[in-house]
A protein has these predicted regions:
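Extracytoplasmic "Venus flytrap"
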Residues: 29-50, 54-55, 63-80, 86, ...
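Flexible loop/hinge segments that line or gate small-molecule binding clefts
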Residues: 105-143, 147, 159-172, 176, ...
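Hydrophobic alpha-helical
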Residues: 91-111, 116, 192, 214-294
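Hydrophobic alpha-helical segments within soluble ligand-binding/sensing domains
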Residues: 28, 74, 135-168, 187, ...
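Hinge/cleft segment of the Venus flytrap/periplasmic-binding protein
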Residues: 58, 167-172, 176-180, 184, ...
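Short, solvent-exposed amphipathic alpha-helices that sit
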Residues: 43-58, 144-148, 183-211, 231, ...
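Solvent-exposed loop/turn segments at secondary-structure junctions
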Residues: 38-42, 68-72, 94-98, 122-126, ...
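Short, low-complexity disordered leader/linker segments with a strong preference
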Residues: 1-31, 56-57, 61, 104-114, ...
Length: 356
């Protein structure tokens, strides 16, 4: 009887782990291989958590890989997974500055005759369309910048006098860019300001003014391309030592490409005595609507963000995975309104200010 019980327990353990993923383990034949540009990105971690749950719920064996921001590492991980017999690649590509990295991964998948699904970080249509078993799941990356800019502009029109700390009739801002060469970062950096200026102009207010006139780029970029809170904290801590109310040239507005950088900026502001829950607030805006950002909005240290739906993205990724696995039409079960041509699914954005 004891022997039978032991056998049954062993069988249950095997079943319970059948759909579980590892984090960059050795890999095995038939599994779905999921590659993340980094595990440390808060939004991407939200996608990973949701996707792990959906994959397990659908009894899909999978393995997660962390490239830690290194494209060479990710490409080697892809090669290893294919050599181990992976049945499908789901890729959050590291390098978005050119088509080379994504095209190389497509070529590897094509040679192995397995599907590849890219997500979140932009991959050009020409790359995706070069293989009939390749699709991309992302967002209308320009829309996040447009929505953020409009949200900022409307907030400033309603609160102009309060935000204009030095009373010069203009709003001085800092922009934190996540990565050079990344299409999402480029669009958010441009439209976050342009669309805000359009709202200000319509209200008879002057354009935003970048705090440092010597910076012709009009942004500060994470040199590691990781969209990190640390980069924003370091930049803003340094800037606040020179640009302050005491000097009459205060930074009065913070715009960030993502919530991680927005939260990093808040850390620097709080160290300088702002956004602490009492006293003066310098408005901070981000993108992603992470839980940490929602908490910051709730406690008043952040004003607003643009929701990037991590759960919605994970759900679509797993639906596409099942479609490829089961031989169904690629976009079966996906909202047709979000399907672009034969190569892409866009996950909608939404504004988030804590009131919606």
């Amino acid at each position: 009887m004891k022997k039978l019980t032991a056998i049954l327990l062993a069988a249950l353990l095997v079943f319970s782990f059948a759909a579980c993923g590892q984090n960059g383990g050795p890999g095995k034949t038939g599994e779905v291989s999921v590659f993340y540009y980094t595990f440390s990105d808060t939004y991407i971690s939200s996608v990973r958590t949701a996707m792990d749950s959906y994959l397990k719920a659908n009894n899909i064996e999978f393995n997660n890989y962390d490239a830690n921001g290194n494209q060479t590492t990710q490409t080697e991980q892809v090669q290893t997974a294919i050599a181990k017999g992976s049945s499908m690649l789901i890729v959050n590509v590291v390098d978005t500055g050119s088509n080379d990295a994504a095209q190389n991964i497509v070529n590897l998948a094509k040679a192995a005759n397995i599907p590849v699904i890219f997500f979140n970080r932009s991959v050009d249509e020409s790359v995706v369309s070069s293989y009939d078993k390749c699709v991309f799941v992302g967002t209308d990356y320009e829309m996040a910048g447009h929505m953020q800019g409009k949200m900022i502009g409307e907030y400033l029109v309603e609160n102009y006098g309060k935000v204009d700390l030095n009373g010069d009739g203009k709003i001085s801002y800092v922009m934190f860019k996540g990565q050079e060469g990344n299409m999402e970062a480029i669009a958010r950096t441009q439209y976050g300001v342009d669309d805000c200026n359009a709202v200000l102009t319509a209200a008879g207010k002057p354009f935003l003014e970048f705090y440092d006139p010597s910076n012709t780029d009009k942004y500060l970029v994470d040199q590691d391309g990781l969209w990190s809170s640390a980069a924003a904290t370091n930049y803003l801590s340094t800037a606040l030592a020179q640009y302050s109310e005491a000097n009459g040239n205060m930074i009065e507005l913070v715009i960030a490409n993502n919530d991680e950088m927005a939260l990093g900026a808040i850390s620097a502001l709080q160290a300088a005595g702002y956004n602490t829950g009492s006293g003066k607030v310098i408005p901070v805006f981000g993108v992603d609507a992470t839980d940490a950002a929602k908490n910051a909005i709730a406690n008043g240290s952040m004003i607003g963000t643009i929701k990037q739906d991590a759960d919605g993205m994970a759900n679509v990724l797993v639906q596409l995975t099942k479609n490829f696995r089961d031989g169904k039409a690629t976009f079966d079960g996906v909202d047709a309104a979000n399907v672009i041509g034969t190569w892409r699914v866009n996950i909608p954005y939404a504004t988030y200010t804590g009131e919606n």
